[in-house]
Amino acid sequence: LSSGGKFQKLSDSGSAVVAQPSGNPTPAAQQPAGQPSGPVKVSVDNDPVLGNKNAPVTLIEFSDYECPFCKKSFTDLLPELKKNYIDTGKVKLVYRDFPLSFHANAQKEAEAAECARSQSNDATYFKFHDQIFTQSTVGGTGLALTQLPVIAKNLGLNVNQFQQCLDSGKFKDEVAKDMADGTAIGVSGTPSWVIGASSKDGQIEGQLIVGAQPFSAFKAIIDEKLNGK
């Protein structure tokens, strides 16, 4: 499925590119915005899971906390996915980080959510995740790093432990692993997703979706996977 919704990617020079398939795109926006030919295969790694861990279908999201189109997916798409598939036990969402270099605080925001998780569990991770997207300014421009320990405090976490974790860069390599795995399957911007049948070894082979797609695009693929196709 090619990109039917906007997403942010890196150009060859490392600058931001907003890709959109409709109209007359600029030369920069004509850089590849779709998916590799054929299915892709990627691990869920040890990343946080939202929903039933034994769900038959896995949705892996590669996302950036400062990406405006990731925020759009958070506000528009995620509630529909939760209502129809995640909360009903049919789909589990695995969140993997893909912080783009031109978003100044995205890397540390990704590490911060992992620091929150390390004190508790996946549920706490997604509470932290939700707060970053909810509190980010219109357009998803992210938060000041000083706001991250405030979120941690509001979630009942040990703030000193959280700040030490964040300052140490404990999860820098974890975030880099997510980036490397995404890049290996052709992810070049956010949000990007892989939908496939769940597997015992955590290797998900499935469809790569790029951009802030509507719920209908996900529904069509998820229903196919649920029907064993």
Label every PLM stretch briefly.
Residues L1-Q30, F62, D76, P149-K229:
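C-terminal cap of thioredoxin/glutaredoxin-like
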Residues V40-V57:
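A short beta-strand-turn-helix
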Residues A55, I60-K153, I185-S188:
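Structural alpha/beta surface segment adjacent to cysteine/selenocysteine redox centers
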Residues D47, L100, S136, Q163, ...:
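Conserved short-loop catalytic and cofactor-binding motifs
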Residues V44-D47, L78-E80, M179-A180:
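A generic local structural motif
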Residues V49-G51, P99-S101, V210:
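Generic, ordered loop/turn and secondary-structure boundary motif
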Residues A28-S43:
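Short coil-to-helix leader/linker segments, especially the first N-terminal amphipathic alpha-helix
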